[in-house]
Amino acid sequence: MRLLARHAIRLLGQENSAGEVASLSRGAIRLKATTGYLNLATASVQPLEPEKQVLRKNSPLTDSFGRHHTYLRISLTERCNLRCDYCMPAEGVPLQPKNKLLTTEEILRLARIFVEQGVRKIRLTGGEPTVRRDIVEIVAQMKALPELEQIGITTNGLVLTRLLLPLQRAGLDNLNISLDTLKRDRFEKITRRKGWERVIAGIDLAVQLGYRPKVNCVLMRDFNEDEICDFVEFTRNRPVDVRFIEYMPFSGNKWHTERLISYKDTLQIIRQRWPDFKALPNGPNDTSKAYAVPGFKGQVGFITSMTEHFCGTCNRLRLTADGNIKVCLFGNKEFSLRDAMRDESVSEEQLVDLIGAAVQRKKKQHADAAPRLHHHLHPYSYHHAYHTSRLQLQARNYSQLTHVDGQGKAQMVDVGAKPSTTRLARAEATVQVGEKLTQLIADNQVAKGDVLTVAQIAGIMGAKRTAELIPLCHNISLSSVKVQATLLKTEQSVRLEATVRCSGQTGVEMEALTAVSVAALTVYDMCKAVSHDICITNVRLLSKSGGKRDFQREEPQNGIVTEVE
């Protein structure tokens, strides 16, 4: 039971404490509600019959935004038989010890558990899944799961001519093939291996066997953008779905956005040659925007994870080769089901509870925490991002950001067309000062003077200079700035609250936040001669009104001890 609690604590992440694992009762993990993920707006979902709504709501595979996850991607291996230069060095990469990876029995057990909880589609990925000797057996055993509707595989296609017929007999339903070029020489240069002919032969064999394979192509500027129309032409006589995937422009420590070719740019290139290139209907959980040239046997799709995310309808979970569950491809949080499964004291019911707890931690969208870069990137950096389990980066989502244009360049928002309204914003910050400083502030004995009054004045001045401190922030004519400093003796802290008002075309939340931040820094500056164990915390917006989207946070429950107005 202690191990199960440790698993849950690890899942909660560094920002939460062990105290948030409220209890373990009858094998069920109950997590305390924490501000920040239970107060977010619920994403829209497709209407269901009432009884199905109840089942989905109570399912461990339904997250806090109502998204029910029916699609599981399982990475069978970290190994690959290609050496694509954007994935790994020519000599390969260090692999995890075998005992750290899931065994075949563990993979099949987890697949069964997920299917019993509501997964209806499984895709086997890697690395390269066909390097496993037991790939056919795994497909056959998963296909035998009574409630599983589809099983697919994503592969580089090198050995399809040898394996596809046995895989079809085992029950393989669908097939994705990764191919970034239709030119033999370019293929050998990028993959450092021969085999382009075998991949094309594998695609043609798949068509002959009745499949409609999906061909995944990562578009990169100055690499294969000259082949965009060639890939569309590839669909003329073949019933295949070519899917252009936007390049995730991360390399080493830097974003290289110059290599990104956006969906709209690609669409424009295609329509220059085929003006009647038209959109097709999409399913509710499709990641690809479907298009086709009239009369062609195949179609084209666009996976726009960089410029237009599809988080609102995401129904996918990922299981890594070493047994971690990932609820988001772009997230850095992973949670080991392997460790829990190998602990004999953890029951299957408890394992399901852990899966449910992981799903509940899924965010509304992968860009909601801003485009952050994480330090521990898996060596297989891009092409297998759609079937590699441990890519850890946050996507830049330019189309959703107001202060950058479509190419990621900085721009100031034009508010000229907005109506002029009365705008109001409130923000707060807390400065933990400790017992000694609390008494000195209360007695007005701090050597630099009246801490609360000076902090109040500094906050007002800070609000008025916000446009000089925050890039691209509008210079606003403020009608009122009020900063309140409160000494909380019991908490040994100073609470700062700012209320800012204006009549204008843009809001004043940044002015309110700047006011409390500058006031908090002033408290630190005036008190640092006494102690450096001062902590500025809880800087946050309390409310804003008068704009397109009002906001109201629940009021803090702090007792007022000393007040300066």
Swiss-Prot record:
GTP binds at residues 73, 123, 154, 214, 316-318. Coiled coil: none annotated. The keyword Glycoprotein does not apply. S-adenosyl-L-methionine binds at residues 86, 127, 178, 248. The keyword Iron applies. The active site is at residue 525. Gene3D superfamilies: Aldolase class I (3.20.20.70), Molybdopterin cofactor biosynthesis C (MoaC) domain (3.30.70.640). Pathway: Cofactor biosynthesis; molybdopterin biosynthesis. Residues 64-276 form the Radical SAM core domain. It catalyses: GTP + AH2 + S-adenosyl-L-methionine = (8S)-3',8-cyclo-7,8-dihydroguanosine 5'-triphosphate + 5'-deoxyadenosine + L-methionine + A + H(+); (8S)-3',8-cyclo-7,8-dihydroguanosine 5'-triphosphate = cyclic pyranopterin phosphate + diphosphate. It comes from the Eukaryota. Pfam families: Fer4_12, MoaC, Mob_synth_C, Radical_SAM. GO terms for biological process: inter-male aggressive behavior; Mo-molybdopterin cofactor biosynthetic process; molybdopterin cofactor biosynthetic process. [4Fe-4S] cluster 2 binds at residues 311, 314, 328. Its cofactor is [4Fe-4S] cluster. One of its GO terms (cellular component) is mitochondrial matrix. Isoform Mocs1a seems to be translated from a bicistronic transcript while isoform Mocs1b seems to be translated from a monocistronic mRNA that is derived by alternative splicing. Isoform Mocs1a and isoform Mocs1b probably form a complex that catalyzes the conversion of 5'-GTP to cyclic pyranopterin monophosphate (cPMP). Mocs1a catalyzes the cyclization of GTP to (8S)-3',8-cyclo-7,8-dihydroguanosine 5'-triphosphate and Mocs1b catalyzes the subsequent conversion of (8S)-3',8-cyclo-7,8-dihydroguanosine 5'-triphosphate to cPMP. In the C-terminal section; belongs to the MoaC family. This is Molybdenum cofactor biosynthesis protein 1. It comes from Drosophila melanogaster. The lineage of its organism: Eukaryota, Metazoa, Ecdysozoa, Arthropoda, Hexapoda. The gene is Mocs1.
